[in-house]
């Protein structure tokens, strides 16, 4: 810096766009995972509270669109709660695998600069390091895993939404949707 001046501070000493991009990406996704976990924990608490309010509310569970057995609404909602907990578990497991520092991987084969990767991991809030430098720059599977976890979680919510919609039909008449959440036909009654 003394010889070159302030421009020297812009040198990519010991780092590459490859490891920088993966580092920033992992920091972004760990935030998304934490936000998702927080939302799921709150949703699960609300579902459990609603289940507790309905331990004696009898309903029919259907299989293949046929009445099968009597259960309680509380029992049904606890199934939703269990599905939410499995999603929380998946996100927490992903967080552990994903929150590893790739910085210092360089372009792919590391760097000759004496970087303290453990220190950068600690400073950036990572729990550890991606040990293999090629994986540190080429490993992007955490994005696909996050998308997969989202799809699994949202399919569970989709099941709930679909069943509530079905229960609100004239054939079932088990639930009533607030008009703000229901659509109507412009032609049919």
Ranges and model annotations:
Residues 1-110, 115-122, 184, 188:
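A helix-coil-helix interface module used to build multimeric assemblies
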Residues 124-189:
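Acidic, glycine-rich loop-and-beta core segments that form the ion-binding/anion-interacting portion
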């Amino acid at each position: 810096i003394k010889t070159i001046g302030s421009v020297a501070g812009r040198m990519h000493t010991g780092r590459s766009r490859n490891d920088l991009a993966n580092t920033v990406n992992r920091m972004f996704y760990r935030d998304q995972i934490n936000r998702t976990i927080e939302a799921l924990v709150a949703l699960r608490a609300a579902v459990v509270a609603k289940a507790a309010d309905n331990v004696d509310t009898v309903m029919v569970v259907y299989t293949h669109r046929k009445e099968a057995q009597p259960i309680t609404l509380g029992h049904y909602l606890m199934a939703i709660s269990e599905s939410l907990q499995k999603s929380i578990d998946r996100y927490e497991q992903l967080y552990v695998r994903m929150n590893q520092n790739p910085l210092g991987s360089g372009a792919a084969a590391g760097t000759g600069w004496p970087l303290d990767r453990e220190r950068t991991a600690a400073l950036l809030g990572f729990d550890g390091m991606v040990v293999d430098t090629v994986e540190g720059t080429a490993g992007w599977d955490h994005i696909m895993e996050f998308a997969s976890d989202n799809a699994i979680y949202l399919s569970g919510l989709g099941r709930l939404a679909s069943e509530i919609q079905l229960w609100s039909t004239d054939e079932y008449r088990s639930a009533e949707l607030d008009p703000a959440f229901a659509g109507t036909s412009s032609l049919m009654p």
